[in-house]
Curated annotation (Swiss-Prot):
Record carries keyword Hydrolase: no
Positions annotated as glycosylated: N4, N19
Organism, scientific name: Mus musculus (Mouse)
Protein name per Swiss-Prot or TrEMBL: Prostaglandin F2-alpha receptor
Primary location recorded for the protein, binned into one broad class: membrane
Disulphide linkage map: C108-C186
Membrane topology according to the record: Multi-pass membrane protein
Topological domains, Cytoplasmic: 56-69, 132-152, 225-250, 308-366
Statement: the UniProt record of this protein carries the keyword Metal-binding: no
Transmembrane feature ranges: 32-55, 70-90, 110-131, 153-175, 199-224, 251-267, 286-307
Encoding gene (name): Ptgfr
Localization (cell): Cell membrane
SUPFAM superfamilies (alphabetical): Family A G protein-coupled receptor-like
GO molecular function, one term: prostaglandin F receptor activity
Amino acid sequence: MSMNSSKQPVSPAAGLIANTTCQTENRLSVFFSIIFMTVGILSNSLAIAILMKAYQRFRQKSKASFLLLASGLVITDFFGHLINGGIAVFVYASDKDWIRFDQSNILCSIFGISMVFSGLCPLFLGSAMAIERCIGVTNPIFHSTKITSKHVKMILSGVCMFAVFVAVLPILGHRDYQIQASRTWCFYNTEHIEDWEDRFYLLFFSFLGLLALGVSFSCNAVTGVTLLRVKFRSQQHRQGRSHHLEMIIQLLAIMCVSCVCWSPFLVTMANIAINGNNSPVTCETTLFALRMATWNQILDPWVYILLRKAVLRNLYKLASRCCGVNIISLHIWELSSIKNSLKVAAISESPAAEKESQQASSEAGL
């Protein structure tokens, strides 16, 4: 199969320059791109430091696997800001003249691969985190004995490799990534849908993203319900409530941020794939949906920066003082692991625990 696009590298940019209907202000866009990239890099760097410190603290506990996956997600967001933001700033600074600086279409391909990878990989990792927490809450004994850091690292590597495969799939199929109508970013072909393959890449991307969001929503719902049931049924194990509350708030925040930021872009890509050249989606709509998606990489780290136990405790105290409510005893914020409380509750209700208690009592009688 011959690659016509590689023989005529100028045509992708040339066609868009001639027919562009979506323009952006260069100076303003460069300024905002630099601000977005800087804030994203600093936020993710701070979140990485916090998560790594927490991982060292909980290395031997059930929360370590959650922190390891969360660190992978934030690191992915960090490199997404670094690579995509750096290329975007360069494109704006070069007056979006792709013919001059990317005649071979190499930079556009790198940009497109990075966009797909940095978009799907955090969604996949968010789903993996939701599944891991769901198992850890609903079956804590299995989680603590069978799911080790080695397994989590293998899952993390597998998720990243699959995201890389999806990102390079068009290149393997001899399809170049295309410069979009705004001439500021590269992605799958969205302007002139030619055949089923163009539709497939867009639908596949949207399907995987929406599937990841659906899995996260389902698992987080099960996790939240289970934690609430444990909280109300096991009042004697009050020391675990701090991590219960911290986990519920973080999981809900991650899910809400991902859904709000990514749903418009995923639905927009699916709409373009289904309707093809007759799609009512405009360049401005696509660009707005893309900017919404990029906010996910900025907001993700703040979930782990702000929604920590120490911060929530201070916010609770501040809110109580502002509202004039007496601060109740904050025993719910005592240091403990969710593993301990859930494991005690699970063991106390299991048949094996009853047998062990009977054996212990018989031995004591002897």
